[in-house]
Curated annotation (Swiss-Prot):
Coiled-coil residue spans: none
Family matches, as SUPFAM superfamilies: RuvA domain 2-like (SSF47781)
Key word Membrane present: no
Naturally occurring in which organism (per UniProt): Escherichia coli O9:H4 (strain HS)
Pfam families: RadC (PF04002), UPF0758_N (PF20582)
GO biological process: proteolysis
Protein name in the entry: UPF0758 protein YicR
Gene name of this polypeptide: yicR
CDD domains tied to this protein: MPN_DUF2466 (cd08071)
Family per similarity comment: Belongs to the UPF0758 family. YicR subfamily.
Keyword set includes Protease: yes
Sequence ranges assigned to domain MPN in this UniProt record: 100-222
Length: 222
């Protein structure tokens, strides 16, 4: 009863002020629903965030880290992984609706939902039509912890097949640092030059790290 009573507080706050009014602790408590023996759900949520540093750190943790620190079992671990997967699928659906990309933030959030937590480098491309509406997105290449082999001709072949007019490139850095390497810059230049011959525009290349990102377009590199 104590857990349920304390959980009602963030619920009441949400109903009165909206979901965005909740703190990270309160939002996490809503999903956890119950605490553990001798620890109410708000206290548990606060301790979890303190141990992992942020929601990002918590949602990308492995089970061994999770249970080792908190000892609260596989059920709550599954709940949290479910939250992350739900967010990923939500953005996946939004990007399939053929609507124009509303903002750079929407694009970044989608890419973070797709690439965060991957243990290998993944190279993705978002294919757009002439109105910059999403046609599709695809994980075209996957590599190792710190390298992925990218072939511009494969990107162009896919773009021609689906009649794309513009592209957004993206890949992740499993190390966590989003700063582009020299190799990242070189492959971007190669892709841009190859696309120019086919009248394809590369709008951006976004590198996703751990809780951070770098946009080539924002830095003026594209």
């Amino acid at each position: 009863m104590k857990n349920n009573a304390q959980l009602l507080m963030p619920r009441e706050k949400m109903l009165k002020f909206g979901i965005s009014a909740l703190t990270d602790v309160e939002l996490l408590a809503l999903f956890l629903r119950t605490g553990t023996r001798g620890k109410d759900v708000l206290t548990l949520a606060k301790e979890m965030l303190e141990n992992f540093g942020s929601l990002y750190g918590l949602l990308t943790s492995e089970y061994e880290q999770f249970s080792g620190v908190h000892g609260i079992g596989v059920a709550k671990f599954a709940q949290l992984k479910g939250i992350a997967e739900l967010a990923r699928r939500y953005y996946n659906v939004r990007m399939r609706e053929k609507s124009p990309l509303l903002s750079p933030e929407m694009t970044r959030e989608f890419l973070q939902s797709q690439l965060t937590g991957e243990e290998r480098e993944i190279f993705m491309v978002i294919f757009l039509d002439s109105q910059h509406r999403v046609i599709t997105h695809s994980r075209l290449f996957s590599g190792t912890l710190n390298h992925v082999e990218v072939h511009p001709r494969e990107i162009i072949r896919e773009a021609i097949k689906i009649n794309a007019s513009a592209l957004i490139l993206a890949h992740n850095h499993p190390s966590g640092c989003a700063e582009p390497s020299k190799a990242d810059k070189l492959i971007t230049e190669r892709i841009i030059k190859s696309c120019q011959f086919m009248d394809l525009r590369v709008l951006d290349h976004i590198v996703i790290g751990r809780g951070e990102y770098v946009s080539f377009a924002e830095r003026g590199w594209i």
